[in-house]
Amino acid sequence: MARAVHRSGLVALGIATALMASCAFAAKDVVVAVGSNFTTLDPYDANDTLSQAVAKSFYQGLFGLDKEMKLKNVLAESYTVSDDGITYTVKLREGIKFQDGTDFNAAAVKANLDRASDPANHLKRYNLYKNIAKTEAIDPTTVKITLKQPFSAFINILAHPATAMISPAALEKYGKEIGFYPVGTGPYELDTWNQTDFVKVKKFAGYWQPGLPKLDSITWRPVADNNTRAAMLQTGEAQFAFPIPYEQATLLEKNKNIELMASPSIMQRYISMNVTQKPFDNPKVREALNYAINRPALVKVAFAGYATPATGVVPPSIAYAQSYKPWPYDPVKARELLKEAGYPNGFSTTLWSSHNHSTAQKVLQFTQQQLAQVGIKAQVTAMDAGQRAAEVEGKGQKESGVRMFYTGWSASTGEADWALSPLFASQNWPPTLFNTAFYSNKQVDDFLAQALKTNDPAEKTRLYKAAQDIIWQESPWIPLVVEKLVSAHSKNLTGFWIMPDTGFSFEDADLQ
């Protein structure tokens, strides 16, 4: 009997000890509810900001951007540029290892940039690196990158989230499958990827920055429905959610356990029109559609006021952005222009969206109703990431089914070239990049190319203005809004925020 009691006492003591330990050392596990799924964990092969944001769990670049989109050193200590703008010499930090134990050094940088700049690899972000002529490892901590021609925004390319340093041993081991097996120098390493449900990352014990990371794990969970994301925060199923349904922002703000954040962004939302296809090859049709959309009403209906009507094709916070008089809402003028263009009774078309979350659905419904008022019947489709990759990003002009396409773009390099060239340069039609209007203008191409060859701010201003003036006049887009970024998190989560390009910053995140 005494023996049995003693065992019970030990069991009870064990349970109590375990409970005390769990309280003292509770796992710091964070769930992040995001608006759509991920396409790949290879940053060089991802066209969407979300996939690249999640990849920051594992990967780092030579440089990065802070939350004001200012350049910062990461794996690099410093850099110099030759007088002719052709050669970039980068000094690297020492003593850093990849998550598989491989040394981070100049040879690793060369392996990554050689892969990225080789067109034979067919990587979606190849266009960022196509100007690299060669990369040389001068010594273990010195890399020399030689360009084919001067490219004044190149250091911003090295700071882009795509320019991640992947373990060369992992690249050799996994080859084209590297998107499923990320190995970087970042604060977290892959735990589980359930491709239909979540990506879970865990603390990398060998991370090079002392005291980091502070979290034990992060689970990135795609939740397409806005209301469900908000509910997960309120029930404690998630500690961070983005984007937050605008209509629920006020409600969440009243919750004493949740902090709501509305921050400026460089995310421009727009509808591109395929100018190689009728009726969008007619400038009057494109002009008519711009008059047909009531942007201030769209801001209220779909974004609950957390956006501003677009005044250009580049968000105002990007350097060299030009602002114009916003398109007024004038359905009478729209119908007149359609009649002049030969469409007195309107026409039928398709309107696709690059996302299927609730806000995108609202934009589609609102736009569909607005177009109907001027005689245009639009069949709408909200795509998931897989559909978008296959039907939009993966098809060239001849086979593309894109007509009208609602999407968004944030220039993750923080400068004007990446806000313009991927979307308007002739060489950047899909599947190369994201010129979903299939727009082409030789003058625009020339102005954009010349702007990259000069470091003179006045000359850059002139060239970028000239390009934007033409684009605004020819209207391959219906520019809609520049978003404000609305996110929310549990008050006990710190150091986790949204970047202006809609990416995430979480390296020093902690759960109190």
Curated annotation (Swiss-Prot):
- Keyword Transport listed: yes
What GO biological process term is on the record, naming one? glutathione transport
Alphabetically sorted, this entry's keywords are: Periplasm, Signal, Transport
CDD domains named in the record: PBP2_Ylib_like
Q: What is known of its domains?
A: Glutathione binding may promote conformational change, from inactive to active form.
Question: Which PANTHER family does this one have?
Answer: GLUTATHIONE-BINDING PROTEIN GSIB, PERIPLASMIC BINDING COMPONENT OF ABC TRANSPORTER
Assembly and partners are described as: The complex is composed of two ATP-binding proteins (GsiA), two transmembrane proteins (GsiC and GsiD) and a solute-binding protein (GsiB). In the presence of glutathione, interacts with the transmembrane proteins GsiC and GsiD.
* Protein name, as recorded: Glutathione-binding protein GsiB
- Organism field: Escherichia coli (strain K12)
